[in-house]
């Protein structure tokens, strides 16, 4: 969600205990080897969290230094209040997770607390599927972190679920989070990136001796994936293991319950860029479960991210963030008609109304549209496609917005409430029309005479006087 540094997504959660982190793990890019070292968001977070009072001559200096460190981490000059809040909530959420899950979630680099929850729910569903069930006393529900331990790693201590120290730096480069020692070494590496390169070079001679220990030192990621994959039914196992045949390292065979024979060893560390998560609807594959979850919303029409200001809903948190800026910041992109926008792309779409530019044309009737989405929705008129069906009465709709509005007839829900007078509405368009009564906004502009209107219907009535179809109101 925020910033990617050194080619890796920042890990916002707490760092595992120092003795479990292992040697310094830093991914070095070519430009860094030339002398350009870019500090990570995680490093700034740790500097802020681990700052000590004894490092300053007095309380005022300590407070001043804390403010500087906090700004370096949260970057309030570029991040919104909501982004900063989400960062803090995600950090605390990862802090309260059991150790068995904490580092596993960090491995997937969630962009928000909601995405971290989705990862855990996906993992829990994996473990609840047939073939993953572990015998438990009646009426006792085990949490997901206990299911992980009992479904394949019960013989291992909780500490074994944490990433194990490796003898070389490069083994974590493809998927490990960026951890920087908070000591004098940090300053040395920050001032001279060549030391990072020396660290990597000095360990290359030890690789041959470490290869036999690699399966035991793969750490948390290998343990979790082996538990999930090894316990799946055979049909699902074949699907999950696509493109894993070329993996070098394998985990020792796992013993099945009640069986003396161990299962065949399966690859545990996925190949970089491998797409193991497959959509059941269209077959599209993804490299992590969070991207699959986002993709599924294109089929379900789900929009879980709702703007608290106007009630508009979005399928992705990033789209909500962009939208929310329209409520918080100035709108620097002005149109000659006086309407302003927070993004240049919105201004371009709006200007097509003045120029009558409509680059997207329907092949059946020739009608043109300014946006591709409008053309897709229009085309369903010709095909008769109505993919959105109401579960209550079976009525179908060509657009998800139509289904959402219809479902409120069953529930009686009116989520759009006016803060000025308290009146509630079941549809955002009705709410927006009403809200213009209070603001006096008239966003619909006649390009013939320049007169403005508060609703599109009033503009259409007015334009008839120019086309000769009727008189203006």
Swiss-Prot record:
UniProt keyword annotations, A-Z: Activator, Differentiation, DNA-binding, Isopeptide bond, Meiosis, Metal-binding, Nucleus, Repeat, Spermatogenesis, Transcription, Transcription regulation, Ubl conjugation, Zinc, Zinc-finger
C2H2-type Zn finger ranges: 277-299, 305-327, 333-354, 360-382, 388-410, 416-438, 444-466
Bias type Polar residues, positions: 148-165
SCAN box domain location: 45-127
Region Disordered: start-end pairs: 127-167, 244-272
Top-rank taxon, per record: Eukaryota
Bias-annotated ranges (Basic and acidic residues): 258-272
UniProt subcellular location: Nucleus
GO terms for cellular component: nucleus
GO biological processes: cell differentiation; male meiosis I; regulation of transcription by RNA polymerase II; spermatogenesis
UniProt cross-references to SMART domains, sorted A to Z: SCAN, ZnF_C2H2
InterPro entries: SCAN_dom (IPR003309), SCAN_sf (IPR038269), Znf_C2H2_sf (IPR036236), Znf_C2H2_type (IPR013087)
Cross-link (Glycyl lysine isopeptide (Lys-Gly) (interchain with G-Cter in SUMO2)): 27, 221, 232, 349
Stated role: Strong transcriptional activator. Plays an important role in spermatogenesis; essential for the progression of meiotic prophase I in spermatocytes.
Entry similarity comment: Belongs to the krueppel C2H2-type zinc-finger protein family.
Protein name (record): Zinc finger and SCAN domain-containing protein 21
């Amino acid at each position: 969600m925020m910033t990617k540094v050194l080619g890796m997504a920042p890990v916002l959660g707490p760092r595992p205990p120092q003795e479990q982190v292992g040697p310094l793990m830093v991914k070095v890019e070519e430009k860094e080897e030339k002398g350009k070292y870019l500090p990570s968001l995680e490093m700034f977070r740790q500097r802020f969290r681990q700052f000590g009072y004894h490092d300053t001559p007095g309380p005022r200096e300590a407070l001043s230094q804390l403010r500087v460190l906090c700004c370096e981490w949260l970057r309030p000059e570029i991040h919104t209040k909501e982004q900063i809040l989400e960062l803090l909530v995600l950090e605390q959420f990862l802090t309260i997770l059991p150790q068995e899950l904490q580092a596993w979630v960090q491995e997937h680099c969630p962009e928000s607390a909601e995405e971290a929850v989705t990862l855990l729910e996906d993992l829990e569903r994996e473990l609840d599927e047939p073939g993953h069930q572990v015998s438990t006393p009646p009426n006792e529900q085990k949490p997901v972190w206990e299911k992980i331990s009992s479904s394949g790693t019960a013989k291992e201590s909780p500490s074994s679920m944490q990433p194990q120290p490796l003898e070389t730096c490069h083994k974590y480069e493809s998927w490990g989070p960026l951890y920087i020692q908070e000591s004098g070494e940090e300053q040395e590496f920050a001032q001279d990136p060549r030391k990072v390169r020396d660290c990597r070079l000095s360990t290359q001679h030890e690789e041959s001796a470490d290869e036999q220990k690699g399966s035991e030192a793969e750490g948390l990621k290998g343990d979790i994936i082996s538990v999930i994959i090894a316990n799946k039914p055979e049909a699902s196992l074949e699907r999950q293991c696509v493109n894993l045949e070329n993996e070098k390292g394998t985990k020792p065979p796992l013993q099945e319950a009640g069986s003396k024979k161990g299962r065949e060893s399966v690859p545990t560390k996925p190949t970089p860029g491998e797409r193991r998560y497959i959509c059941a609807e269209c077959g599209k594959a993804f490299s992590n479960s969070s991207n699959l979850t986002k993709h599924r919303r294109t089929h379900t029409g789900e929009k879980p991210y709702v703007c608290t200001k106007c009630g508009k809903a979005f399928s992705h948190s990033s789209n909500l963030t962009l939208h929310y800026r329209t409520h918080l910041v100035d709108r620097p992109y002005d149109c000659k008609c006086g309407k302003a926008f927070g993004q240049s792309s919105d201004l371009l779409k709006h200007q097509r109304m003045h120029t009558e530019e409509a680059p997207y044309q329907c092949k059946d009737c020739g009608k043109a549209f300014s946006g591709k989405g409008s053309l897709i929705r229009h085309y369903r008129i010709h095909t008769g496609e109505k993919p959105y069906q109401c579960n209550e009465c079976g009525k179908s709709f060509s657009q998800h917005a139509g289904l959402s509005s219809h479902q409120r007839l069953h529930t009686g829900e009116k989520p759009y409430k006016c803060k000025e007078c308290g009146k509630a509405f079941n549809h955002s368009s009705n709410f927006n029309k009403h809200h213009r009564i209070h603001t006096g906004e008239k966003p619909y502009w006649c390009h013939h005479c320049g007169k403005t209107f508060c609703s599109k219907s009033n503009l259409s009535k007015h334009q008839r006087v120019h086309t000769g179809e009727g008189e203006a109101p």
